[in-house]
Amino acid sequence: MAKVIVRKNESLDDALRRFKRGVSKDGTLQEYRKREFYVKPSVARKLKSEAAQKRNKKKGR
């Protein structure tokens, strides 16, 4: 969990920018989006397979 303590003489925008950087670095938002909806194991395998095929197709170019 990202935690930011606002420093003395620091603007709120700067603190918010540091918080956003911390959240993206931790991967908190990605984890939330991943767990937002339940994905059945069969669908997850299919998506993973399709992503691998797409990666391999890109590498072959």
Swiss-Prot record:
GO CC terms, sorted: ribonucleoprotein complex; ribosome
Membrane-spanning segments: none
Keywords: Ribonucleoprotein, Ribosomal protein
Listed GO biological process terms: translation
UniProt-listed InterPro entries: Ribosomal_bS21, Ribosomal_bS21_CS, Ribosomal_bS21_sf
Family per similarity comment: Belongs to the bacterial ribosomal protein bS21 family.
Name listed for the protein in its UniProt record: Small ribosomal subunit protein bS21
Name of encoding gene: rpsU
